[in-house]
Curated annotation (Swiss-Prot):
Residues given in the record as ATP binding sites: 467, 507-512
Role played: ATP-dependent microtubule severing protein. Severs microtubules along their length and depolymerizes their ends, primarily the minus-end, suppressing microtubule growth from and attachment to centrosomes. Microtubule severing may promote rapid reorganization of cellular microtubule arrays and the release of microtubules from the centrosome following nucleation. Microtubule release from the mitotic spindle poles may allow depolymerization of the microtubule end proximal to the spindle pole, leading to poleward microtubule flux and poleward motion of chromosome.
Keyword Aminoacyl-tRNA synthetase: no
Keyword S-adenosyl-L-methionine belongs to the record: no
Composition skew (Pro residues), residue ranges: 205-214
Protein's GO biological process: anatomical structure morphogenesis; cell division
Name of the protein: Fidgetin
Family statement: Belongs to the AAA ATPase family.
Keywords: ATP-binding, Cell cycle, Cell division, Cytoplasm, Cytoskeleton, Microtubule, Mitosis, Nucleotide-binding, Nucleus
Cellular localization per UniProt: Nucleus matrix; Cytoplasm, Cytoskeleton, Microtubule organizing center, Centrosome
Length: 736
């Protein structure tokens, strides 16, 4: 450890404190040296933690106050009763009586004359008082004699109630702040013609001007403020008391900050009123760090920095992943949003636009870039609030929140360029009104059922969560998501993709792809089951389809996923079939989505029997993508992921053998195989042993457990079905 001049002070200060011959003033000076040279120096240089600094401050403050109130060669004059100091620090006070009675002071007349001349206008009422020793760290709960903040006539102020008081009321904010800081205009205090005993004893010195550097204020409205406060570390110079400490107003001085460190910008004043106490002629001390915050946060953080380094994605700045939800500034609307914070999807609209990775506000661009983008305009997407109340469905105007899916780039002449935009914000806003009105007039029970059972509230899905399917994922990114996210870059397309058909074997991850698309767009996800519509909800299936699309329009952007769509669009349906009503309603909604490009609704349909869909209805799906069986890499990823969550003893060679033996398995088949093998160690165990066993005592999963399961689970997809998918994809598919 390096020897510094501060270490040389320890021995001298310890002798000054422990010596029995030293005066109280000398001991107090030694304690002040402890605070100034050791505690403040160590805390400012991060040599000690915030908790250690707080404990040291409490220790020194108690000893310091004990010296000031303890017995000395000069007995105190009736400062307290016999019991009060004993309760505080265990020391008795041998006080003497006052040598003379109460007498008036000339400063009272000066105060009256000063108030008449208007030198101190708008003074608070004189009933707010505090005692000299009323620090919360000394005796905040005891009844003490009341003294004025003025240094003259203090002992007579209580009896001369008829004289207008010159006491300055203050809102005491829980820790010693600088006396000149006030929420309003500061009124200078009158000088005292009679110095107080503290001044005459040399403990207080003439006040210098206040320090110019400020730090964030700590007020009583903060729930994290330390619950105890301490007497001041000393009585260094300060200015006279100004009228009124504003709660959460101007912050204390930054005397405790190390030199060379810029002071943070003061926080705005709090609107919560504080408690009024009389002001003190004490010096400010370093405030205790907030609970849960480090000292570096208070001393060195000048402003809040929004971390964006971890926001990596394949979309760069155009990522709308729901994984970051409301905490990320990427989803917060600008302050000039068309919808106030009480409407829309419920996300915070007060984010600083300078910290947005995908800026939704107007941006100045060079002239060449303006020509390049052609004055295209757009708004940033905001993911839906899955926790929003059901009753707010009818009151949402999502078109106001989201001008369009696309580009955030706006020219400087944004208002003039709106008339040239194919899908303006105003058009999207007006188009959402009919959906709102229809939803308000719908059956409340039906809307609640759709909200609870069809509107999904699941965790977001990333591309890395889907094993394999690289061709399908690349096609969705390039031909579906990017045209929606950047319509200005795909202006050559006749129509943007608004409906997709995913076909392929069962259990290959089509629904997972739909969830991932919703996550990447930051959109609400509605899952309609075709099999449930033709069985469970056959009687009111068309109403459910209509309500689902109405909610999707009110919660734009949204993704409507319809599984087993071949049951609804089959060419073998008879005219008398009740499914025809559901089919007609679905086609009506698809026509509305395809004919309204300003609506931000993406329809994703899924089927394992694409050949059964009516040929005339294939035109409704702009993109038709094959989702094949997982390849060897995808099967290895699935097996490794499932085994990593359990105790197993398989070598790499055995895992590779499992991957080879699962050729032809769907993703769901591989999952079922692993699940059956993971419970293999439990088979054949007696019931008594199983009841007393804990999970850690179960033997690891071995290759033999998988061997036993292979005889039970076979591929669920036949080669004939695979050939059918291949042929249909060659004729009508759009992906490979």
């Amino acid at each position: 450890m390096q020897w510094t001049p501060e270490h040389a002070q320890w021995a001298e200060q310890h002798f000054d404190i422990s010596s029995t011959t030293r005066s109280l003033a000398h001991k107090a000076e030694a304690y002040r040296g402890h605070l100034q040279r050791t505690y403040q120096y160590a805390w400012a240089n991060d040599d000690i933690s915030a908790l250690t600094a707080s404990n040291l401050l409490k220790k020194y403050a108690e000893k310091y106050s004990g010296i000031l109130e303890g017995p000395s060669e000069r007995a105190l004059l009736c400062s307290y009763s016999e019991s009060a100091p004993g309760l505080l620090n265990g020391r008795k006070s041998e006080s003497d009586a006052w040598q003379e009675g109460i007498y008036p002071m000339s400063c009272a007349a000066d105060v009256i004359s000063a108030s008449k001349t208007g030198m101190t206008p708008a003074l608070p009422p004189p009933d707010v008082t505090a005692s000299v020793g009323s620090s919360t760290g000394v005796a905040s709960s005891l009844s003490e004699p009341s003294y004025s903040s003025s240094n003259c006539g203090n002992h007579a102020s209580a009896l001369h109630s008829g004289i207008p008081s010159q006491e300055f009321a203050s809102s005491y904010n829980g820790s010693y702040l600088h006396s000149t800081y006030s929420g309003g205009q500061s009124t200078p205090a009158l000088p005292s013609p009679h110095p107080s005993p503290l001044h005459s004893a040399g403990l207080l010195q003439p006040p210098p001007p206040p320090p110019p550097t400020l730090v964030p204020s700590y007020n009583t409205s903060s729930p994290n403020l330390s619950s105890y406060n301490y007497p001041p570390a000393g009585y260094p110079p300060q200015t006279p008391v100004a009228p009124g400490y504003s709660p959460g107003g101007a912050p204390p001085p930054s005397a405790y900050l190390p030199s060379g460190i810029a002071a943070p910008t003061p926080l705005p004043p709090s609107t919560i009123p504080g408690y009024s106490y009389q002001s003190h002629n004490h010096a400010p001390i370093a405030p205790t760090p907030l609970n849960g915050s480090s000292a570096n946060t208070l001393k060195r953080k000048a402003f809040y920095m929004t971390g964006q380094g971890d926001m990596d994605s394949s979309y760069g700045n155009f990522n709308y992943s729901q994984q970051r939800s409301a905490q990320s500034p990427m989803y917060r609307m600008p302050d000039n949003s068309l919808v106030d914070s009480t409407r829309g999807n419920g996300f915070d609209r007060n984010a600083d636009t300078s910290s947005l990775a995908f800026k939704p506000t107007k941006q100045s661009m060079p002239t060449d870039q303006q020509r390049k983008f052609g004055s295209q305009a757009g708004r940033a997407l905001t993911p839906p609030s899955y926790g929003s109340s059901k009753g707010s469905l009818g009151s949402m105007r999502s078109g106001e929140s989201f001008g369009k899916f696309g580009s955030p780039v706006m020219s400087d002449h944004g208002d003039d360029s709106r008339q040239h935009l194919p899908h303006s914000i105003d058009t999207a806003t007006s188009s959402s009104h009919p959906a709102e009105e229809q939803l308000k007039n719908s059956d409340a029970n039906l809307v609640e059922m759709v909200t609870t059972e069809i509107l999904q509230q699941t965790s977001p899905v990333d591309w890395s969560d889907i094993a394999g399917l690289e061709m399908a994922k690349a096609t969705i990114k390039d031909e579906v998501l990017w045209p929606i996210l950047r319509p200005d870059m795909f202006s050559g397309l006749a129509t943007l993709p608004r409906s997709i058909l995913l076909f392929g074997p069962q259990g290959t991850g089509r629904t997972l792809l739909g969830r991932c698309m919703a996550s990447q767009l930051g959109a609400a996800f509605l899952l309609l089951s075709g099999s449930a519509l033709v069985t469970k909800w056959l009687g009111e299936g068309e109403k459910i389809v209509q309500a689902s699309f109405l909610i999707a329009r009110c919660r734009q952007p949204s993704v409507v996923f319809i599984s087993d769509v071949d049951l609804l669009l089959s060419s073998q349906l008879s005219e008398e079939s009740p499914v025809n009503r559901i089919k007609s309603e679905l086609l009506l909604q698809l026509d509305g989505v395809l004919s309204s490009p300003e609506e931000h609704v993406l329809v994703v349909c899924s089927t394992s029997k694409p050949e059964e869909i009516d040929e005339s209805l294939r035109r409704y799906f702009v993109k038709r993508l094959l989702v094949p069986l997982p390849d060897a890499t995808a099967r290895h990823q699935i097996i490794s992921q499932l085994l990593s969550q359990h105790n197993y003893c398989l070598s790499d060679k055995e895992v590779t053998l499992l991957v080879q033996r699962t050729d032809g398995f769907s993703g769901l088949d591989v999952v079922r195989l692993c699940q059956e093998a993971l419970v293999g160690p439990l088979h054949g165990m007696p019931g008594a042993d199983l009841s007393g066993m804990i999970p850690g005592q179960m033997r690891p999963v071995s290759y033999q457990d998988f061997e036993n399961v292979f005889c039970k689970i076979q591929p669920s997809i036949s080669q004939k079905e695979l050939d059918t998918y291949t042929e249909w994809n060659k004729m009508f598919g759009c992906s490979q």
